[in-house]
Amino acid sequence: MINTIFCATGYGNGAKIVAVEGSFHRGLPSFNISGLANHSIQEAKHRVQSALQSAQIPLPPMRFVLNLSPADLPKSGSHFDLPIALLGAMQKEILQEEWFAFGELGLDGTLKHQEGIFPLLLEIALQRRGAKVILPKGGEEIFSPIPNLTLYFASSLQEALEILKSPPPPIERKGLEFESIEILGEKYYYTQDFDFDFSEVLGQDVAKRVALISACGMHNFILEGSPGCGKSMIAKRMRGILPPMSLEEMIECVKLQALGNQSISYSPLRPFRSPHQSASKSSILGSATSLEAKAGEIALAHRGILFFDELPHFKKDILESLREPLENNCLVISRVHSKIEYETSFLFVGAQNPCPCGNLLSSSKECRCQEREISHYRNKLSEPFWDRIDMFVQMSEKREGSVGLSSREMQEKVFEVFKIQKLRGQKNFNGKLRAKEIAQYCILESECFELIEKMQDKFGLSFRGVQKIKKVARSIADLEGSEKIKKSHLIEAFGYRKI
């Protein structure tokens, strides 16, 4: 007779569901755990035996065999105590339903609250909607808001066993109290609380236009200009105008908050990560060992914005390492005993001065840099890196002019384009479309093909460069409500290309 209770273990910036299988067999009394369980799980034998004894459910004089499946996945965490103990207690009964259980046991059978299981629960909410989960008491305030799960809380092994045999009514949960729009039967959540507003950025109409197009399609862009011209101002205001979030995306972002040791808040605001230029490569990319994986800034920016201020001051190997996540929306870290894959679908924003002193484009200050210094400064960004950037704009030094669109007005335009993309059947934003999707959704008017050939011949555009221009043109066309991409849309998109 074999029973199975499910649990989970951390894996990259997510988690893997683990089936904990248990069975009793005739033979000399023993307690064996297989399936690449680390020391914290192997030590569970002693805690579980003591907890079962305290609950007056001693293990029978038989072989107790446990298998953690998949067997080739390394597993860790004392939260496996509870499912192991429950399987030890279910000696003559067969579970009829699928259950998840998490919790560390004391020797007296009490369950101990663990905040570290929070990201695991969020991953289960994404993978197994409606799953029944038993958790230790003490975490109600943190865990209860998690959607898609039916949660039960127990203070001891005995209580958990009673829940397993006769489930009480689940706890009541409040719904998400955010503004939302509904498209094709699915809700997308947003907020209009703007900590920073685009109305505060005077002038800079071209840069604000680029920011709007970028937000519509999640296009990567770089701003160049003299110190104080408003590069960082624009980057910090991008977060407020990004597309609304689905429930699944919100869960992913809350999970990233937990992985990044941030305070937990359920919010439709997308992540905004801005590492310092002195940050190490492992803090940017993340790290992986056979026992532990730590998400870096790239992974923590998933579904949001990754902002590199003073871009050329970052180490060259870090900048080159961005090429894979910018191209494939994922990052694979391979080590001798481990291989971790992080999802990295983010909007990259870079800001840089035109030269080391910053005054090259200034009309009032003299540049103090030599030619070789400027050349070395600009060569920090390679051609393959630039090829992955959708838009580039040089900002003027003047900070005067009209107020232009506010963040609320820009957000409304972004939402209109977001709705167009969803009604068109797109699963990805315009800026994240794959080659097949570009052919399907980036439909060009007949006069555009000749223009593309001329641009390729004259400027030597790569295939990737042409695809980038098409995707930006798609967002521009959506802003104008045009079903097909027109010549004017391509010309504007090409104007933002770094040649």
Question: What is each model feature region?
Answer:
Residues M1-I222, C229, E483-K487, I491-A493, ...:
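Peripheral, non-AAA+ core regions of ATP-driven protein-machinery
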Residues S34-K45, P60, N67-G77, S290-A293, ...:
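Basic, amphipathic alpha-helical bundle interface domains used for macromolecular binding and assembly
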Residues F102, A154, A301, F308-L311:
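Hydrophobic residues in beta-strands of the RecA-like P-loop NTPase core, especially within AAA+ ATPase
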Residues L107, L306, H313-F314:
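Residues immediately C-terminal
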Residues L212-S214, S265, L269-P271, A279-L306:
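Conserved alpha-helical scaffold flanking the Walker A/P-loop in AAA+ ATPase domains
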Residues F221-Q262, N328:
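Walker A/P-loop
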Residues L223, F308, A351:
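Hydrophobic anchor at the beta1->P-loop junction of P-loop NTPases
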Residues G225, R303, D309-L311, S321:
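Walker B catalytic acidic pair
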